[in-house]
């Protein structure tokens, strides 16, 4: 099965990255940083939870007059201190989506942005223990866990831009994984920061995530529609840096993901059994290097 080959590549990556030279921080031993090979002003921060599927990336993009931090991870350890050691520019945070492994450290920052459709989900998750999504495969003390906060989060929409000085970051709304799921295009490098939408691990469009607001956007069909809508723009990107798995993926992943959504919509019952993570639904579709794990009630 092709998806098993791809997940073996992911497991190999998870082992290899632990051996690579990285910037480490006394103030937060949970995070390692790597400079992008094309642009040292893009810094990738890696939180290794000991589980190759759950380890998460945050991305710091630095311009001449400002910086943008994409996601804040699980909220374990002092992330603000890490960012302060990497840039002296004023920092804004943009959450690619509301899930707890991407928003856990938000309370450490003042200027936080999120797509308007995900803000209600994020607010609801603050009062739900399961919404915190703390890793279960990593040893850490409760003292290291950053308290959540309902401080004001600014709403964004498709096409909004962040001007950092010498580079512009453009928001691309890409629903499916969440109602307000987004990606970000960097004008200087052509890198697409693809969040949990397009990555080297499976994209999840499953009923394990709530569908209270804008339920029609938590579907494979909505994902496909957004890919088609933005394909002219996405075809111009050069590389993909997702929130999980390998970085600097070829832009072929974009068209492969569109084809994967097409195949699911044509024949939703044509799937393979996915047993990599027992707690997840077992239906997976794989087209080239693109993978989607889905449930039948999230097709349309």
Residue ranges and their predicted role:
Residues 1-29, 225-300:
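Accessory terminal helices/loops
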Residues 29-85, 184-200:
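Conserved beta-strand hairpin/beta-sheet module of binuclear metal-dependent hydrolase folds
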Residues 46-48, 97, 116, 244:
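Residues at the C-termini of beta-strands that transition into short coil/loop
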Residues 51, 121, 249:
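Flexible, glycine-rich phosphate/dinucleotide-binding loops
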Residues 5-6, 74-163, 200, 253-268:
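Active-site HxH/HxHxD metal-binding segment of metal-dependent hydrolases
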Residues 18-40, 67-69, 75, 111-175, 178, 188, ...:
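Metallo-beta-lactamase
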Residues 48-50, 99, 169:
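Short beta-turn/strand-loop junction motif enriched in small, turn-promoting residues
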């Amino acid at each position: 099965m092709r998806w098993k080959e791809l997940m073996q590549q992911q497991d190999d990556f998870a082992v290899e990255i632990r051996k690579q030279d990285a910037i480490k921080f006394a103030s937060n031993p949970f995070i390692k940083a790597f400079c992008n090979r094309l642009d040292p002003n893009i810094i990738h921060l890696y939180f290794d939870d000991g589980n190759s599927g759950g380890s998460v990336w945050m991305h710091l993009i630095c311009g001449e007059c400002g910086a943008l931090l994409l996601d804040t991870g699980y909220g374990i350890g002092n992330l603000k201190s890490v960012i302060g050691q990497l840039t002296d520019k004023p920092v804004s945070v943009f959450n690619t989506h509301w899930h707890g492994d991407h928003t856990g450290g938000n309370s450490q920052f003042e200027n936080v942005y999120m797509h308007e459709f995900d803000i209600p989900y994020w607010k609801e998750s603050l009062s739900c223990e399961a919404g915190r999504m703390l890793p279960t495969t990593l040893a850490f003390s409760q003292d290291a866990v950053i308290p959540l906060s309902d401080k004001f989060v600014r709403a964004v929409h498709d096409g909004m831009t962040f001007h950092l000085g010498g580079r512009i970051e453009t928001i691309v709304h890409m629903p499916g994984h969440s109602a307000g799921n987004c990606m970000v295009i960097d004008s200087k490098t052509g890198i697409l920061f693809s969040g949990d939408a397009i990555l080297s691990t499976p994209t999840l469009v499953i009923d394990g995530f709530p569908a209270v607001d804008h339920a029609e956007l938590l579907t494979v069909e909505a994902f496909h529609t957004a890919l088609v809508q933005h394909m002219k723009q996405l075809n111009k990107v050069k590389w993909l840096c997702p929130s999980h798995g390998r970085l600097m993926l070829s832009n072929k992943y974009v068209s492969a993901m569109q084809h994967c959504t097409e195949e699911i919509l044509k024949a939703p019952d044509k799937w393979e059994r996915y047993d990599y993570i027992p707690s997840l639904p077992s239906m997976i579709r794989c087209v080239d290097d693109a993978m989607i794990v889905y449930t039948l009630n999230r097709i349309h």
